Amino acid sequence: MGEGEENGNEADSNERSLALSPTWSVAIVLTVFVVVSLIVERSIYRLSTWLRKTKRKPMFAALEKMKEELMLLGFISLLLTATSSTIANICVPSSFYNDRFLPCTRSEIQEELESGSTVKRNLLTKSLFFNIFRRRLDVIKRTTCSEGHEPFVSYEGLEQLHRFIFIMAVTHVTYSCLTMLLAIVKIHSWRIWEDVARLDRHDCLTAVAREKIFRRQTTFVQYHTSAPLAKNRILIWVTCFFRQFGRSVDRSDYLTLRKGFIVNHHLTLKYDFHSYMIRSMEEEFQRIVGVSGPLWGFVVAFMLFNIKGSNLYFWIAIIPVTLVLLVGAKLQHVIATLALENAGLTEYPSGVKLRPRDELFWFNKPELLLSLIHFILFQNSFELASFFWFWWQFGYSSCFLKNHYLVYFRLLLGFAGQFLCSYSTLPLYALVTQMGTNYKAALIPQRIRETIRGWGKATRRKRRHGLYGDDSTVRTETSTIASLEEYDHQVLDVTETSFEQQRKQQEQGTTELELQPIQPRNDCVPNDTSSRVGTPLLRPWLSISSPTTTIELRSEPMETLSRSSSLPSEKRV
């Protein structure tokens, strides 16, 4: 009897409610939770304030998306806590619970209960959490299901799912921050190449020297300048595949792609391509930090098909590494293709300069690679979160982690794939995807984009309030002059147009926005072999239209500028 009473008192102490708990213990626990929550909240607030002050709007948007993700996971957690007792009291016939859709067999669970394998966990875990299998037996007493029926999901199962959501949130946010940090560090290491390239901003080099620099390609191209291996497609892919494990981008690659981008979009040689690339990557980063609906669907599908004998965790560890290698090889292949075309080793009639185009990418969509990178990063964080969850909730020797060598292999693949994707693939993507047909929205200074958005909002607001008909046009009696060269020092000079220009605008029903370059000083005298001097930033005219507003960007009518995918389609009123 004494031993039975002692066990009963121990069980009662484990299940003690707040009414029987000392007030000091409750106050201490509450204080710890409040202090930790306030520290996290204030840290996020100060980070948001710093991003706003430094005008890093893309990074601020990415942080807001991470906060939305945490809020969503917090809402799911709160919903599970509030409805756990109700769900646990939903009873279904025991015949529905067969061994077909179980991740572990009942015999394995029984062996773990008998051997007490979970008791071998470290002292910290035992002191912080109740024994998981012992509580599983205690929960049976709480259910109200009759004989022959079982809870739809047990109370303990809902608690375990609750903890998985918490681990998933922490792991995904941590992986996202590390990914951006490693990518920024890698891209900033290219800054010295940008500074060297801008030494020729006055366009003073001779044609022979410039042609030598322009044709100075990667070691890959230099190795394949002799036929017939230069046109061997299989050898090119094999070389690109192995090159991503070393120095994925060297100086000649960067200078060549930079020159190709500047020439293709008619920018001056002094344009800061490196800063534009960082702005572009920051804007795209907000697309890879969140968890979209399809990714949540992947989590649900994994929970459904993770049955005994499927080895699903092994396959989900293989998928992200495979995708990282494929994406990295494809990006290297784009560089190799452009370099070979420039060296005259392919049949593509590219002439003497690079021809960036969407056809170089899969399905003519460079943005498809970003979606794959998003899936890779989420998959890696999900793999690590699953490991921590299994080890925390079921023990290191449970049926989920029984094969230790396979667990080590999965973790090694996950860390290697994450590092390769963050430090090599993502920076390479930021550079190579600039070789698409269209430039990205980051090329346009922020103030001009805000001005265009403001006009669009004003138009929609006036139409919504019926201030003018559908055939009306929003007119601005000013001309905006800006330079794309100095992003951090943008100047919007507003000048009045002449009466004749106003009359023409009213007749044509258009609003004109002129982008004129700041003429650079020519500190050297051009000779017969030097190329053009003082090339304007935007040569062709570009029209941005909507059903009610037409905006024209005009400069010298020389070549046709490719339309950015971020701009609406052209439509004349």
From Swiss-Prot:
<dbReference type="GO" id="GO:0016020">
    <property type="term" value="C:membrane"/>
</dbReference>
<keyword id="KW-0611">Plant defense</keyword>
<feature type="transmembrane region" description="Helical; Name=2">
    <location>
        <begin position="70"/>
        <end position="90"/>
    </location>
</feature>
<feature type="region of interest" description="Disordered">
    <location>
        <begin position="500"/>
        <end position="532"/>
    </location>
</feature>
<dbReference type="GO" id="GO:0005516">
    <property type="term" value="F:calmodulin binding"/>
</dbReference>
<feature type="transmembrane region" description="Helical; Name=1">
    <location>
        <begin position="20"/>
        <end position="40"/>
    </location>
</feature>
<dbReference type="Pfam" id="PF03094">
    <property type="entry name" value="Mlo"/>
</dbReference>
<keyword id="KW-0472">Membrane</keyword>
<comment type="function">
    <text>May be involved in modulation of pathogen defense and leaf cell death. Activity seems to be regulated by Ca(2+)-dependent calmodulin binding and seems not to require heterotrimeric G proteins.</text>
</comment>
<feature type="transmembrane region" description="Helical; Name=7">
    <location>
        <begin position="412"/>
        <end position="432"/>
    </location>
</feature>
<feature type="transmembrane region" description="Helical; Name=6">
    <location>
        <begin position="372"/>
        <end position="392"/>
    </location>
</feature>
<dbReference type="InterPro" id="IPR004326">
    <property type="entry name" value="Mlo"/>
</dbReference>
<keyword id="KW-0812">Transmembrane</keyword>
<feature type="transmembrane region" description="Helical; Name=5">
    <location>
        <begin position="309"/>
        <end position="329"/>
    </location>
</feature>
<feature type="compositionally biased region" description="Low complexity">
    <location>
        <begin position="507"/>
        <end position="516"/>
    </location>
</feature>
<feature type="topological domain" description="Cytoplasmic">
    <location>
        <begin position="185"/>
        <end position="287"/>
    </location>
</feature>
<dbReference type="GO" id="GO:0006952">
    <property type="term" value="P:defense response"/>
</dbReference>
<feature type="transmembrane region" description="Helical; Name=4">
    <location>
        <begin position="288"/>
        <end position="308"/>
    </location>
</feature>
<feature type="topological domain" description="Extracellular">
    <location>
        <begin position="393"/>
        <end position="411"/>
    </location>
</feature>
<keyword id="KW-0112">Calmodulin-binding</keyword>
<comment type="similarity">
    <text>Belongs to the MLO family.</text>
</comment>
<keyword id="KW-1133">Transmembrane helix</keyword>
<feature type="region of interest" description="Calmodulin-binding">
    <location>
        <begin position="446"/>
        <end position="467"/>
    </location>
</feature>
<feature type="topological domain" description="Cytoplasmic">
    <location>
        <begin position="41"/>
        <end position="69"/>
    </location>
</feature>
<feature type="topological domain" description="Extracellular">
    <location>
        <begin position="1"/>
        <end position="19"/>
    </location>
</feature>
<feature type="compositionally biased region" description="Polar residues">
    <location>
        <begin position="561"/>
        <end position="573"/>
    </location>
</feature>
<feature type="transmembrane region" description="Helical; Name=3">
    <location>
        <begin position="164"/>
        <end position="184"/>
    </location>
</feature>
<protein>
    <recommendedName>
        <fullName>MLO-like protein 11</fullName>
    </recommendedName>
</protein>
<feature type="region of interest" description="Disordered">
    <location>
        <begin position="554"/>
        <end position="573"/>
    </location>
</feature>
<feature type="topological domain" description="Extracellular">
    <location>
        <begin position="91"/>
        <end position="163"/>
    </location>
</feature>
<keyword id="KW-0568">Pathogenesis-related protein</keyword>
<feature type="topological domain" description="Cytoplasmic">
    <location>
        <begin position="433"/>
        <end position="573"/>
    </location>
</feature>
<feature type="topological domain" description="Cytoplasmic">
    <location>
        <begin position="330"/>
        <end position="371"/>
    </location>
</feature>
